[in-house]
Amino acid sequence: MIMDFLSEKFALKSQPSKNSDFYMGAGGSLEHVMETLDNESFYSKTSGSKCVQAFNPLQRAEHHVRLERTSPCQDTNVNYGITKVEGQPLHTELSRPMDNCNNLRMSPVKGPQEKGDLDELGDKCDSNVSSSKKRRHRTTFTSLQLEELEKVFQKTHYPDVYVREQLALRTELTEARVQVWFQNRRAKWRKRERYGQIQQAKSHFAATYDVSVLPRTDSYPQIQNNLWAGNAASGSVVTSCMLPRDTSSCMTPYSHSPRTDSGYTGFSNHQNQFSHMPLNNFFTDSLLSGATNGHAFETKPEFERRSSSIAVLRMKAKEHAANISWAM
């Protein structure tokens, strides 16, 4: 039944042969079609093209299996097969020599000789990788070499090639080593210059702002005492009125006579003097008296100085108000 269907579908060009394996082209999946067809060509009845697709059988020669595909439409034969030698693994045929330390076979190590070859190849790869990187060596200079180098550096920081070569001959160094030394020496010199400028700025700042302006813990009570002493020693009428409790020096004694304008003449005069006298005189007199007693008022900070003067003025105002109320 199958043969009848094939004979109707295809026209056989040659007689079929038995005992041959046929597989589809290499581009698709290997699929077993028929076992009884061998070396035949098929013509498609439905296809309008006259191109003939011929499939050669699998040929076996010298234990090789080759899969080929040919097309009668073209003159060239395209080989899509992979040669395989029976009795050997496939990866031994696929291995090819590769450069850059990749020439390693895929087969396992069979003996000590092959293992030694692999070790030698690995050592060679390591040596090639390490040699590609530049190794940096630290040069130890002697005292004579440093002396010669410093002499030239004092003259010029940027010696030319001729000077570097002459210096290299005298110091028994290479010109590259001399050049590197001058680069490092210039960097060190610039660093010292920056550090010196910073220190100079710090010293200038310390000289401008003296340390003596710092506050003293024992200066406030002494300054306050000096202020009171200065007020007592000054010859102003107002300070002499405020310091003592006795009001005889400030106003006339209170008389039980009827109130007259002449009874308050002394108090009114002193009050007029106090009203016309500026408050800055209190602070000025206290500063002068404090300076003459040996403690300069400039040693106090600005904030503490202001607070002390305000406190003194408030205390004086309270005493003056109390004296006025007692006199009334």
From Swiss-Prot:
What protein family does this chain belong to? Belongs to the paired homeobox family.
- Region listing for Transactivation domain, in residue ranges: 194-328
User: What remark about domains does the record contain?
Assistant: The OAR motif may negatively regulate DNA-binding and therefore transcriptional activity. It is found in the C-terminal transactivation domain that stimulates transcription.
UniProt keyword terms in alphabetical order: Activator, Developmental protein, DNA-binding, Homeobox, Nucleus, Repressor, Transcription, Transcription regulation
Return the PANTHER family for the record: ALX HOMEOBOX PROTEIN 1, HOMEOBOX PROTEIN ARISTALESS
The GO terms this record gives for MF are: DNA-binding transcription activator activity, RNA polymerase II-specific; RNA polymerase II transcription regulatory region sequence-specific DNA binding
Q: What is this protein called?
A: ALX homeobox protein 1
Q: What is the effect of changing residue 112 to L?
A: Associated with P haplotype
Which InterPro entries has this protein been placed in? HD, Homeobox_CS, Homeodomain-like_sf, OAR_dom, Paired_Homeobox_TFs
Its function, per the record, reads: Sequence-specific DNA-binding transcription factor that binds palindromic sequences within promoters and may activate or repress the transcription of a subset of genes. Most probably regulates the expression of genes involved in the development of mesenchyme-derived craniofacial structures. May therefore play a role in beak development and regulate beak shape.
Q: Which domain of life is it from?
A: Eukaryota
One Pfam family this sequence matches: OAR
Motif OAR, chain ranges: 308-321
Might you name a Gene Ontology BP term for this protein? anterior/posterior pattern specification
